[in-house]
Amino acid sequence: MLQNQTRKLRVLVVDDSSFMRMVIRSVLEKDPAIEVVGIAVDGMEGVEKALALKPDLITMDIEMPRLDGISALKQVMAKCPTRVLMVSTLTCEGAKATFDALDAGAIDYIPKNVTDSADAQRVFREELLRKVKGAASSIFGRPMTTSAPRAIIAPPRQVQPAPRPSQALAGKFHYVGIGASTGGPVALQEVLGRIPGNYPHGIVVAIHMPKAFTGPYAERLNSKCSLQIKEANDGDIIQPGVVLVAPGGRHMALARQGNSIVVRTLSTAECPQYIYIPSVDHMMTTLADATNGSALGVILTGMGSDGFKGMKHLKSKGGITIVQDEATSTIYGMPRACIEGGVADTVLPLTQIGSEIARLGG
């Protein structure tokens, strides 16, 4: 069990596929720290059992009869706020529905990529356990709020003094790198939505997503923000007011080419040392090198410690760093690693980060 976990994590599984119910249940019940307290075959039964059983976490399919997963999620969040992990298909339509679910309050998602392939089944099992345990770290750390992640406007926590006052950092960089994981899709929209379209610097983003999701996600952000936002392609040049999102399933590196900074996309085989894909560490490290430290690094909510090494390298080259605070992080892992590792110049609640990026870059 986790350090602060005093009992088993109680999970409700909601899925209309008997095969998926069996797979999810068998994976979770093999872990002694997890208890599957209920099974529901559609969204309506899922809402009923959520109210009756009050689980710590719900795994929720999206496409179901009687009541779909997003409608069920909205009812759960209205009646008994619970952490919900969406189980979605690896398609463009599945991606769009997943982002709707995240907007409605789901904390994360897992692609439904269970085929006859032994490798695919292994990846699904590992990803499911990793995300459920990541949710557990927040469940046993603090209570669930009644609002979706987008609406988290918690008062700033008392944070350690920043090593460098933010007023002294303005105008010290020409590029921005942002990394995130769990809770990141909604958090990133909040951050980018507060940066004006005429922002004078280029922005690169690495967020842990599968291949089929980053394109629709970039399109979604582009429709909601003033900045121009697109999925990055190999050879793209970083330009002012443009946000390049690392393509899912690959790593993004930055390299200097003459007077420009260009994108290089790499396969997982070319960067086997990274667990998370796309790697925030690799993006931040190469951004620091390509810009000789003339960059602002930002770490948002997410599990694990991806981004810490990259932020540390950026700081060693004179770069600037901002990290999301604990109170507004869906999962505090990535921010915690940076803060406790001493690589955060400034620690801010989510709703202040975008404005600070805009102010410093103005």
Curated annotation (Swiss-Prot):
**Biological processes per GO annotation:** chemotaxis
Please give the residue positions where the record annotates the modification 4-aspartylphosphate: D61
Q: Which GO terms describe its cellular component?
A: cytoplasm
Q: Name the catalysed reactions.
A: [protein]-L-glutamate 5-O-methyl ester + H2O = L-glutamyl-[protein] + methanol + H(+); L-glutaminyl-[protein] + H2O = L-glutamyl-[protein] + NH4(+)
- The answer to whether the entry has keyword DNA damage is no
Point out the coiled-coil segments of this chain: none
Entry's CDD domains? CheB_Rec (cd16432), REC_CheB-like (cd17541)
Q: Where in the cell is it found?
A: Cytoplasm
According to the UniProt entry, what is the EC number of this protein? 3.1.1.61, 3.5.1.44
Post-translational note: Phosphorylated by CheA. Phosphorylation of the N-terminal regulatory domain activates the methylesterase activity.
Catalytic residues identified in the record: S181, H208, D306
Where does this protein chiefly localize? cytoplasm
InterPro entries listed in its UniProt record: CheB-like, CheB_C, CheY-like_superfamily, Sig_transdc_resp-reg_Me-estase, Sig_transdc_resp-reg_receiver
Q: Which GO terms describe its molecular function?
A: phosphorelay response regulator activity; protein-glutamate methylesterase activity; protein-glutamine glutaminase activity
Q: What are the residue boundaries of the CheB-type methylesterase domain, all occurrences included? A: 163-357
Domain Response regulatory, chain residue ranges per copy = 10-127
Keywords recorded for this protein, A-Z: Chemotaxis, Cytoplasm, Hydrolase, Phosphoprotein
Pfam families per UniProt: CheB_methylest, Response_reg
Q: What is known of its domains?
A: Contains a C-terminal catalytic domain, and an N-terminal region which modulates catalytic activity.
- Record NCBIfam families: PRK00742.1 (NF001965)
Q: Which family would the database say this protein is a member of? A: Belongs to the CheB family.
Function noted in UniProt: Involved in chemotaxis. Part of a chemotaxis signal transduction system that modulates chemotaxis in response to various stimuli. Catalyzes the demethylation of specific methylglutamate residues introduced into the chemoreceptors (methyl-accepting chemotaxis proteins or MCP) by CheR. Also mediates the irreversible deamidation of specific glutamine residues to glutamic acid.
Q: Which PANTHER family does the entry mention?
A: PROTEIN-GLUTAMATE METHYLESTERASE/PROTEIN-GLUTAMINE GLUTAMINASE (PTHR42872), PROTEIN-GLUTAMATE METHYLESTERASE_PROTEIN-GLUTAMINE GLUTAMINASE 1 (PTHR42872:SF3)
The entry's protein name is Protein-glutamate methylesterase/protein-glutamine glutaminase 1
To which species is this protein native? Geobacter sulfurreducens (strain ATCC 51573 / DSM 12127 / PCA)
**Encoding gene per record:** cheB1
